[in-house]
């Protein structure tokens, strides 16, 4: 708060009309504090998490989503030829927008997001089992970082199904 007070005083000293900030939730929290001190503020949402309320897409989200999809498309070639399971962790501390989009775009076997508590047996093991029954030999699990450790999820898959997942 001391930093915001100093920033507000500096804005007033310099005679600024206001502050424009490009950023995510941390930047927006700072703007709220400046606004409470009478500074006019404008926030431009820019975060790959796409978690700023009242916005459809934030700057950076589309690039992050497309980069992840391209990387997974390349990874899929190896997965298919070696009949592998991959667990891919994407950004998304408190928001699973990126993981969900990437999972849908790549046809993932399962997508785990922080907004929805998951049951490992039902949401991962059973989906892999059903995919196997339908003839699939490779499986993609997308995990938002806020869900927990992708490495641990990979270990659980190994223990439950005997697969040797690659975690990325």
Regions found by a protein language model. Name each.
Residues 1-38:
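N-terminal glycine-rich phosphate/adenylate-binding segment common to multiple enzyme folds
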Residues 10, 21-23, 33, 61-167:
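Accessory alpha-helical/coil subdomains and C-terminal extensions
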Residues 19-22, 39, 45, 56, ...:
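Short glycine- and Lys/Arg-enriched binding-loop motifs that mark or flank ligand-binding interfaces
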Residues 27-31, 49-53, 94-98:
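Short, well-ordered, mixed-charge alpha-helical segments that flank or form enzyme active sites
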């Amino acid at each position: 708060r001391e930093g915001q007070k100093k920033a507000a005083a500096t804005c007033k000293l310099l005679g600024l009309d206001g502050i424009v900030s490009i950023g995510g939730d941390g930047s927006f929290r700072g703007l709220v504090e400046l606004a409470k001190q009478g500074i006019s503020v404008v926030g431009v949402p820019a975060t790959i998490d796409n978690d700023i309320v009242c916005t459809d897409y934030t700057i950076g989200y589309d690039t992050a989503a497309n980069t992840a999809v391209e990387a997974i498309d390349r990874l899929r070639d190896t997965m298919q030829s070696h009949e592998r399971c991959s667990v891919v962790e994407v950004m998304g501390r408190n928001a699973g927008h990126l993981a969900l989009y990437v999972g849908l775009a790549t046809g993932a076997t399962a997508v785990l997001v922080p907004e929805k508590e998951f049951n490992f047996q039902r949401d991962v093991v059973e989906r892999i089992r059903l995919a196997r029954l339908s003839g699939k030999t490779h499986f993609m699990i997308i995990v938002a970082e806020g869900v927990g450790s992708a490495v641990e999820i990979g270990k659980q898959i190994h223990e439950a199904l005997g697969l040797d997942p690659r975690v990325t």
